[in-house]
């Protein structure tokens, strides 16, 4: 949870949590690819994966330049929507990765997402300018991961979902870093 603390600390904590989750998602994606997806299929699927991400339907910024045009509150809202869209499906990850070294902590991914959700909500409360009143967070979600790893369709579905998970967490990490840099102007700001 996020106790009362300075805004700079709230941002620092949220960025660290987002970085950790993005790294975990990237490692999991790579491990899944290495374990289940034949080399010749890896590149042919990349194009179809990007089209199937739910997050593509959200009018969220897609790049750094686009994100720089948005207010901090808008970026926090987009981040919250992205995080919340994964809360349900991520609970099925541990069943998919029963023997995984990377996802040995998969049961904790849900808790880590909830922590990040709380951190983003704490930032939203701190920055609240009245625009949150009446703001209804939609709770659309991704499909659940398929635990049948003997089925090629299920493998490709999970591969696509992991790709989306990685991309979405990268977006959240980027948005949070951008806001932190904008607010606190650190000289070593790299996004």
Swiss-Prot record:
Localization (cell): Secreted
Protein's organism: Chelonia mydas (Green sea-turtle)
Name of this chain's protein: Somatotropin
Keywords associated with the record: Disulfide bond, Hormone, Metal-binding, Secreted, Zinc
Single GO cellular component term: extracellular space
Gene this protein is translated from: GH
Disulfide bond sites: 53-164, 181-189
Keyword Metal-binding: yes
Entry keyword Secreted: yes
Database matches in PROSITE patterns: SOMATOTROPIN_1 (PS00266), SOMATOTROPIN_2 (PS00338)
GO biological process: animal organ development; growth hormone receptor signaling pathway; positive regulation of growth; positive regulation of receptor signaling pathway via JAK-STAT; response to nutrient levels
Sites where the protein binds Zn(2+): 20, 173
Pfam family, one: Hormone_1
Free-text function comment from the UniProt entry: Growth hormone plays an important role in growth control and is involved in the regulation of several anabolic processes. Implicated as an osmoregulatory substance important for seawater adaptation.
Transmembrane segments: none
The family this protein is said to belong to: Belongs to the somatotropin/prolactin family.
């Amino acid at each position: 949870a996020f106790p009362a603390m300075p805004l700079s600390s709230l941002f620092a904590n949220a960025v660290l949590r987002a970085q950790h989750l993005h790294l975990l998602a990237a490692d999991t994606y790579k491990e899944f690819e290495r374990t289940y997806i034949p080399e010749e299929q890896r590149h042919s699927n990349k194009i179809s994966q990007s089209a199937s991400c739910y997050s593509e339907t959200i009018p969220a910024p897609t790049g750094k330049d686009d994100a720089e045009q948005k207010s901090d509150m808008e970026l926090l809202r987009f981040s919250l929507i992205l995080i919340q869209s994964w809360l349900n499906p991520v609970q099925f990850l541990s069943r998919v990765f029963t023997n995984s070294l990377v996802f040995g902590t998969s049961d904790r991914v849900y808790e880590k997402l909830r922590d990040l959700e709380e951190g983003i909500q704490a930032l939203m409360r701190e920055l609240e300018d009245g625009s949150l009143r009446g703001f209804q967070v939609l709770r659309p979600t991704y499909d659940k991961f398929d635990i049948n790893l003997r089925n090629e369709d299920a493998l490709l579905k999970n591969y696509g979902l992991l790709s989306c998970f990685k991309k979405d967490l990268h977006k959240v990490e980027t948005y949070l870093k951008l806001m932190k840099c904008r607010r606190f102007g650190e000289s070593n700001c790299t996004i």
